[in-house]
Amino acid sequence: VVGTPGRILDHLERRTLSFGKLKILVLDEADRMVDMGFLPDVERIIRACPVQRQTMLFSATISSDVNYIEKKYMKSPKSVSAESYVDASKLKQIYFDVPNHLKFSLLVHLLKEEKTGLVMVFCNTRRNADFVARNLIRYGLHAIAIHGGLSQNKRTRTMDEFKAGQTSILVCTDVAARGLDIKNVSHIYNYDMSKNSTEYIHRIGRTARAGKEGEAISLISNRDYEGFAKVKEDDSLNIKPAALPQFENISPKFSEGSGGGYGGGG
C-alpha cells in the first residue's frame, strides 16, 4: 500500500485498511513530510503499526525532527548514505541581480544565447512554473512544466518527453523534481531562488555529473534576497555575480500567478 499520510489515516479511520499483517513500514521523503507539517500524522500511522516490523526511512536531509522519528520509532537503525558525484571544478555558479519585472526577459535572452543541452528551470510555485513554461513556448522555446498539480501519468509523460530530448527545457518545482535522475543536463536556472542552501544544492546537483561541465544560473530580484542570503551562508558554495547583458524587454502574455493568485507550492 502506497499513500500520503492523510489518505492512509482516512482509510484507517474508515476501517478500509488494516495494518494487522504489516511487516514493513517505509517512510519516503521523511524530511519533506516533516517540512509540510505531517509529523503528527506520521506518528499516528507509526503507532497504528505492529511493534514487530521492519522500518525504513528515506530522507534527503536529516533534520532534528527526522532524528526524532529515528530515535523514537526505530530500533538499532543502520544508516546508509548515497549521493551523486558533482565535480565542483566543472560547475560554474553565477547570479544576476535583476529587477523582478525584467526577470523573464533575461531568462529568454539567456536561453536563446547560451549553447545548452537539457535545461532545468526551477520555480518555487506551481503557478510560476506554468507561467514560465507557457510564456517560453510563446517565445519559440521548447518548454514543458512539471509540478505537483499534474497527475502521475502526466508527470511520467512529461519526463519521458524531456529525457528523450523532445523538449529541451523542463520548468519545475522542487517537490516535482525530487528524486529524478536525468542525464545530460547542462544548465540549471533558478528563476525563483531556493529558500536555503540545502534546496539550492539539490538543484545544482543535477548538472556537472560524470565529468561533464555544467552551469547554475540564478536570477535574483528583491523577492529572492532573503533566500539568497541563506544560501550564501554555506561557505562551500562559490556563487559569483555576473554583469547584466544587453537584452530585449519583452512582455509575457500570461500573467504571473494567473488563474487564482500567486501561490500553489510544489
Locations of regions flagged by a protein language model:
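Conserved helicase RecA-like core
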Residues: 1-254
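Intrinsically disordered, low-complexity RNA-associated tracts
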Residues: 250-266
